[in-house]
Amino acid sequence: MSENPIPGYLPAEEGRRRRGAYAIPSLFTTANIFCGFYAVIAALKGYQALGTDLGEATRLFDNAAKAIGFAVLFDALDGRIARMTKTTSDFGVELDSLADVLSFGLAPALLAYAWGYGVTPDIYGLEMGKAAWVISFLYLVCGAFRLARFNVHARRTVTAKDRRQFVGLPIPAAAGLIAAIVHFSPTPLLAQSARSFEVWGNHVLVDSAVLGFLMLLLVAALSGLMISTIRYRSFKDLGVGALSPRWTLLLLSLLVAGIYFYSQWVLIFLASAYVVHGLAMKGLALLRLGRKEPASAEVSTPIKSEP
C-alpha cells in the first residue's frame, strides 16, 4: 500500500529533475560566455596578424564576428527556454547580464577597434588612434548601463507594454550589427581598396580612412541608442502559438536556408532593419504628435466675445 507524500515534500528524483531544468538555461548562457571569450581571443589574434598575414587576420576577424552571432542566438534561447520551462531565477538574470557584458560589450568593441577604426589613418584632423579608444570604451560603458537599466526594470511590475518593448536598443542588437558588418566584409578596413562614387555629379573617393571614420560614427550612434528611451520590439509576445505550425516551420526554414546560403546579406539586413525600425517608429510617433498638437491647440483656444 502506497503512502501519500508529505505536502511540500519533493522526492529526490523529482528534485533532481527540477534542478536539471534550472540548469538548462544556464548551459545556454555558458555557451554565450564561451562565444564572447572566443570572439575576444580571435579579435586579438587578428589584430596581431595584421602586419604579417592579412589572410589570417581576415579569417580571424570573420570568426570573431560569427562567434558574436552565435552568442546572440544563445542569448535569445536561454531566456526563452527559461520562460517556457518556468525556471527563471535571479541567478540566471545576473549570469545572463555578466555574459552579455562580455559577448555584446567587450567583444564587439574590441572587434570594431581591431578590424576597423583602430588601425585606419587619421582623417579630418581627428587622431583616429585616440578616438578609437574613446568610442570603444564609450560603447562598452553604454552597454553596461543598458544592461543595468534592464535589470532594474525587470524587478519592477511588468506590464503588457513592457513585455512587448525594450527601452533603448538592446545590446545584443548593437553587437549583432557590428558583427554583421564585419562578417559582410571581413577584410580589415586598413587593407580595403578605395572606391569612387558619383554623388550629384561629383566624384567622391571612399578610402580606408573614410570607412574607419564612418564605422567610428556608427559605433558612437549605437552607444547612444542603447542608453536612449527609444522603444524597440522585444518579440517576447510571439510565443509558440503565435503562428500556426505550418507558418512557423515555413518561416524558420526560409530563415535557416537564407542564413546558410546568403549569411552575409541576410544577417546584415536583419541587424540593420532591427536597429532602424526603432528609429522609424519613433519618427512616426513624433510625426503623429506634431499633427495632433495644432488641432488640440485650435480646439482649446477660447473665443473672445465682442465688447
Predicted regions and their residues:
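Topogenic membrane-insertion module of multi-pass membrane proteins
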Residues: M1-A76, M281, P307
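C-terminal membrane-associated helical module and adjoining short loops/tails
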Residues: M1-E13, V158, R163-P307
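Multi-pass membrane catalytic core of lipid/isoprenoid biosynthesis enzymes
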Residues: L27, R59, K66, M84-L147
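Hydrophobic alpha-helical transmembrane segments of polytopic
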Residues: F28-A31, A64-A71, I135-L138, C142, ...
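Select subsegments of transmembrane alpha-helices in polytopic membrane proteins
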Residues: P25-I33, S97-F104, V167-G176, L243-T248
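Helix-coil boundary and interhelical linker segments in multi-pass alpha-helical membrane proteins
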Residues: Y38-K66, L110-V134, I181-L214, F261, ...
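Alpha-helical transmembrane segments of polytopic integral membrane proteins
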Residues: F37-V40, F70, F74, P108, ...
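C-terminal ends of transmembrane helices
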Residues: G79-D90, A144-K161, G168, I227-K236
